[in-house]
């Protein structure tokens, strides 16, 4: 039955339920043990992730809970599209096809141990089939994408406009096609492997320019480094663009409201 067995898929979905969802078990412990197992099985994977894994574990658990929920409801189109985008985006981390193989093995073993008595033949069949689907879609989408895995660029300007706000301009090594209102994941040299989302404040530039507005977040390592420590000549790495924020230019008047650096994507749209 595998992916047709809603009861077996429901067991897998509930294993990843958020801890505050009123369900038995501890998905946080499951995900923590999965990463521990994966890093032991394939030590090369550890260097792809940031030192602090808390946010990564939460995001991974939420993603799998949603994917399995969609499979229970027999809605495959959105999960497949989501996993394909995830696979394409993971190229920026240096993820290789063999990493997906070890991920599937580690997650299957961790689920078997975590579910204990609930691990039946039907659940194992559903787990194997679903994990093959998840890793296969991600790996296949990554292989099929002919675009750059990332864009590198050099900081050419850093303007400290206030105590906690900076405008950073870069010259990319090659043009990045994106739509105004989209956002990218950014890695700065002061904080390796700690990626943060930023919205370009200008439309895509054929001349390879790009601009970001960054406000210092108290306690935030990356925003503090960008505002306080970024200098011309620094090399940044950017992911492929995500999301979409569009204006119907054939419609009526539009009122745009933004606060702080939230103005950046609106500025790009207006420009």
Predicted regions and their residues:
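Core of compact, soluble alpha-helical bundle domains
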Residues: 1-151
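Short alpha-helix boundary/capping motifs
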Residues: 28-29, 220-223, 263
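Ferredoxin-reductase
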Residues: 147-235, 241, 252-253
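Fold-independent oxyanion-binding glycine-rich loops
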Residues: 240-241, 259
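Low-complexity, polar/charged sequence tracts that form flexible coils or short amphipathic helices
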Residues: 247-250
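Short, glycine-rich nucleotide/cofactor-binding loops
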Residues: 254-264
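Histidine-anchored nucleotide/phosphate-binding helix
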Residues: 265-271
């Amino acid at each position: 039955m595998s992916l047709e067995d809603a009861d077996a898929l429901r067991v897998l979905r509930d294993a990843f339920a958020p801890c505050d969802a009123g369900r038995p078990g501890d998905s946080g412990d499951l995900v923590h043990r999965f990463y521990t197992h994966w890093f032991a099985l394939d030590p090369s994977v550890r260097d792809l992730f940031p030192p602090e894994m808390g946010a990564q574990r939460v995001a991974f658990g939420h993603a799998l809970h949603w994917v399995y929920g969609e499979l229970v409801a027999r809605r495959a189109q959105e999960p497949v599209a989501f996993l394909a985008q995830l696979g394409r985006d993971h190229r920026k981390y240096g993820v290789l096809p063999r990493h997906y193989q070890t991920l599937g093995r580690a997650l299957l073993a961790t689920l078997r141990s975590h579910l204990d008595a609930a691990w039946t033949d039907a659940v194992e069949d559903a787990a194997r089939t679903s994990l093959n689907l998840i890793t296969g879609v991600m790996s296949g989408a990554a292989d099929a994408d002919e675009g750059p895995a990332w864009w590198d660029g050099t900081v050419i300007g850093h303007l400290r406009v206030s105590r906690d706000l900076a405008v950073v301009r870069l010259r990319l090594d090659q043009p990045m096609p994106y739509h105004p209102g989209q956002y990218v994941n950014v890695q700065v040299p002061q904080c390796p492997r700690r990626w943060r989302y930023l919205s370009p404040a200008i439309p895509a530039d054929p001349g390879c320019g790009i601009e970001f507005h960054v406000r210092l977040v108290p306690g935030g390592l990356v925003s503090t480094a960008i505002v306080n420590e970024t200098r011309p000549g620094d090399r940044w790495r950017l992911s492929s663009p995500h999301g979409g924020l569009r204006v119907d230019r054939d419609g009526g008047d539009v009122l745009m409201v933004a606060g702080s650096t939230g103005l950046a994507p609106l500025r790009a749209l207006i420009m």
